[in-house]
A protein has these predicted regions:
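Bacterial N-terminal signal peptides that target proteins for export
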Residues: 1-11
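C-terminal motif of bacterial Sec signal peptides marking the signal peptidase cleavage site
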Residues: 19-24
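Low-complexity, intrinsically disordered segments exposed to solvent
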Residues: 28-286
Length: 286
């Protein structure tokens, strides 16, 4: 299953807020050593929450994509095609097994976009590489992907990312997931006399996330029951108006604690802290 990419459109209000930054309309008189509670409607925070929520949704999708390989070898081209459908006649799917790794490459290309993803999957049992997932207790999953819009004369989005996850204890009641992710979004607003390039870079750590196994059903939801996810976000806007560019940068620290499919999110930045909860999935019964 390929990840679900949710691209938050900033909208007219957000674009006006961005322009307001450069016009001196965004002011903060809080001393630099004082941290206050932020409002969820703060225009500084709204686009960040959109990216965090998108990232959380895509994380569950990534867990699901990895666990799809837990009951069958990912060498079956038709199986891969089903997971990455729909595929056009000019799209490419290749599957190979080499040096203990299953490597899947999928490329979609049409008049609107180009999408490329490579999955690398290795199974182990007692620290020894095995070919069949039915014998494993450990899975290493690596994904690299890139989505590029070809409609560059209008508002559009480009994305690329990298995932490196280890699933341990897969022969038991639950799997423990650890690893890293990198997620980059480039959002381009194209107006008649102005443009905005919004960049989001997220460096993510997945720490001891637990996913329970359902007897008789395997890993049906890939929904985490516990664990912590942390992210550092670098955000920038370059606004060009009347041929004059201006750039604004922001940095954020995100901490997510998961309890039975509910994420408690804390975002820190600009001497403020924002907190909220989000239902991300329905965990398996255990």
């Amino acid at each position: 299953m390929r990840p679900k990419y949710l691209i938050p459109g900033l909208g007219l209000v957000m674009i006006m807020a961005i322009f307001g930054y450069f016009a001196g309309c965004s002011k903060d008189n809080v001393p630099t050593n004082q941290v206050t509670e932020g409002s969820l409607t703060d225009p500084d925070f709204v686009p960040v929450q959109g990216q965090v929520d998108s990232y959380l949704d895509s994380t569950v999708q990534i867990f699901s994509a990895a666990l799809d390989n837990s009951d069958r070898a990912p060498i079956d081209t038709q199986y891969v095609r089903g997971n990455y459908s729909p595929l056009g006649t000019n799209d490419t799917v290749t599957c190979v097994y080499i040096n203990g790794w299953y490597i899947i490459y999928v490329a979609k290309d049409n008049a609107f976009m180009a999408f490329h993803t490579t999955d690398s999957i290795q199974f182990q049992k007692d620290s020894v590489v095995v070919e069949s997932p039915l014998d494993m207790d450990y899975m290493h999953f690596v994904r690299r992907w890139e989505f590029a819009s070809k409609l560059t004369s209008v508002t559009h989005t480009n994305i690329d990312g990298y995932v490196n996850l280890v699933f341990a204890g897969m022969d038991g009641e639950f799997a423990s997931v650890n690893g890293t992710k990198n997620y980059n979004v480039e959002w381009n607003y194209v107006g008649q006399d102005s443009s905005v390039v919004a960049l989001y870079n997220m460096d993510v750590t997945v720490d001891n996330v637990t996913i329970y196994h359902s007897p008789g059903a395997g890993w049906p939801s890939a929904c985490p029951s516990s664990g912590t996810i942390q992210a550092d976000i670098a955000q920038s806007y370059t606004v060009t108006k009347n041929s004059i560019p201006n750039t604004l940068t922001r940095n954020w620290i995100v901490t997510v604690s998961i309890n039975e499919g509910v994420a408690t999110v804390k975002v820190e930045g600009l001497n403020k802290v924002w907190s909220y909860t989000k239902d991300i999935c329905e965990p398996s019964a255990h």
